[in-house]
Amino acid sequence: MATLHAPAFELPEILNTKTNLADARIGAQVIECSDDFFAEAKRMLQFEAPIFVEDKFDDHGKWMDGWETRRKRHAGYDWCIVKLGVSGKISALDIDTTFFTGNYPASASLEACYAPNSDLTGAKWQSILENTELGPSQHHIFMVNNDAIFTHIRLNIFPDGGVARLRVYGDVHIQVTDHEQTLDLLALENGGRVIAYSDAHFGHPRNLINPGRGVNMGDGWETKRRRAPGYDWCILALGKSGKIEKIEIDTAHFKGNFPAEVSIQAVYLENATDAQLIPQSMFWSYLLEAQPMQMDHIHEYMNEILQHEKVSHIRINMIPDGGISRVRLWGKIAKS
């Protein structure tokens, strides 16, 4: 069977620091849908880019990598309700119809609501995207101007058809209830995000904060081979400021291309803009001085962590280049 892979797609730069709140890896799930006869709705929440397998069929017809409904033979439209993996403010939507060429919806709209207890009875749905025309086999990026916090979304497709992937980009909203709980303060699901980086030729630093261990070498941050003096770096914001108790640096799958050393600098800043952080970061205090790396290994540090107050941002220095799969910063959320 011939398998076609989705063409490379570069997110608009403004979205590179945003989190996909509808990512199944952080707990996003389909609650209910009007119909998913041809392809299960949960597929459109998968992290992996869609594929097309030319000769793959199942009992319902052509297998498609996404959500696809049957052909509508009466008035109405199809819809799907999704519980976001984490609550947050929505900045943009990507309704991706890749490989849906003669079966994509004519148009789509999207609503959102805040229901922290997942009780949608009487939920007040707000329109996030008015009914908008869609095209075949392409990404549709829509910017959203709404400061509200949402937990659920409802995608409406008119009148029927298929969507390969739905991505809901935004900023994670963390409800702090326990300051004594130890969390990975850098994790994607806890609001960690990438701000800037020196290079991402083979793998984006946003992978560093993904859930779980890396599935392969592509699921990590990897830079090109350095042919000049210096080293590579990336700056990340913690989801919530806190005191760091344990650091993990995982080089899973990086065997001939792991860095020689890694160090971490840190700072606490309340109101700095992302643009201000980049030139300042080289002067931040060290949280972890340069440590030698091993291939395909989880490196754990506790006693090596230098004295510090609470931390809001870090700079990871990868010396001189190479690849890292994950970085974890375990600690407690600081009290205001």
UniProtKB/Swiss-Prot annotation:
InterPro entries linked: Allantoicase, Allantoicase_dom, Galactose-bd-like_sf
GO biological process: allantoin catabolic process; purine nucleobase metabolic process
Catalytic activity: allantoate + H2O = (S)-ureidoglycolate + urea
Documented EC number(s): 3.5.3.4
Family (UniProt): Belongs to the allantoicase family.
HAMAP family (alphabetical): Allantoicase
Protein name as catalogued: Probable allantoicase
Source lineage: Bacteria, Pseudomonadati, Pseudomonadota, Gammaproteobacteria, Moraxellales
